């Protein structure tokens, strides 16, 4: 399975779904929730099922509507897709309740409320999820907090810490600066620096910036650096102007071990 750094939200409308076929994102999140009005829910579910039945797409996730979850997953049961994104996760009780519906699907828990953040350790430790994702827009709306990288730093660091502690991937909130690509790219770089495994996006033009920001963490690049370091007799390696020492190589080896373990499952 390909490494996922960039995840593009795609509303489940027919014309939007077709764009998945030419997208450069590592994964796609077909949205049946926030971007879809209540009147469109049934039509969009029909369109999503039709798309999945007629196209082979790797790394497609479905963001379900919690109120319609059982109906949606029942109808999607025979379709091929990698997993689901569960919105507004606030505790493990809901995940327990829906465990049967999640069977054989990768689950991304979207944490986007004050209650969810307050229970982040128990959510991160839940064995049935593969990843955590942060939804800043809902969180800041609920707390009347300004959405800025500086103000959200402690919350994001907490999410990353607990995700890593329990072996889960962690994906950062999407940037809404679709008219300021430079700023969005800077936010993606900040996400990578904080230790996130990737970042979500709401527009295709932000995907290149996300891919570039996380390029330093691509497996092949890491493997190349480790091999070069071990083939020399120096304590320091310089690649493309960047200095790597023993502690960097130890970290890269951990990443490679994790990647190999996941690939063999």
Predicted region positions:
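Expand to "…catalyze enediolate/carbanion chemistry for C-C bond making/breaking, isomerization
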Residues: 1-265
């Amino acid at each position: 399975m390909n490494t996922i750094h960039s995840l593009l939200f795609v509303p489940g409308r027919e014309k939007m779904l077709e764009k998945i076929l030419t997208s450069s994102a590592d994964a796609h999140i077909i949205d049946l929730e926030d971007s879809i009005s209540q009147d469109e829910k049934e039509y969009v579910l029909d369109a999503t099922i039709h798309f999945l039945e007629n196209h082979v797409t790797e790394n497609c996730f479905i963001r379900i509507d919690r109120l319609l979850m059982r109906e949606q997953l029942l109808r999607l049961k025979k379709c091929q897709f990698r997993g689901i994104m569960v919105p507004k996760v606030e505790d493990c009780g809901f995940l327990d309740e829906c465990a049967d519906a999640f069977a054989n699907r990768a689950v991304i828990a979207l944490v986007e409320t004050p209650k969810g953040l307050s229970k982040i350790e128990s959510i991160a430790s839940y064995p049935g999820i593969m990843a955590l994702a942060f939804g800043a827009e809902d969180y800041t709306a609920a707390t009347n907090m300004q959405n800025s990288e500086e103000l959200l730093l402690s919350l994001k660091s907490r999410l990353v810490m607990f995700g890593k502690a329990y072996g889960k991937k962690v994906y950062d909130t999407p940037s809404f600066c679709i008219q300021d690509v430079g700023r969005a790219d800077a936010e993606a770089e900040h996400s990578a620096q904080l230790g996130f495994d990737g970042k979500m996006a709401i527009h295709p033009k932000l995907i290149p910036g996300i891919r570039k920001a996380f390029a330093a963490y691509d497996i092949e690049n890491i493997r190349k650096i480790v091999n070069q370091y071990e083939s020399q007799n120096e304590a320091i390696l310089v690649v493309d102007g960047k200095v790597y020492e023993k502690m960097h190589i130890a970290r890269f080896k951990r990443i490679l071990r994790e990647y190999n373990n996941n690939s063999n499952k």
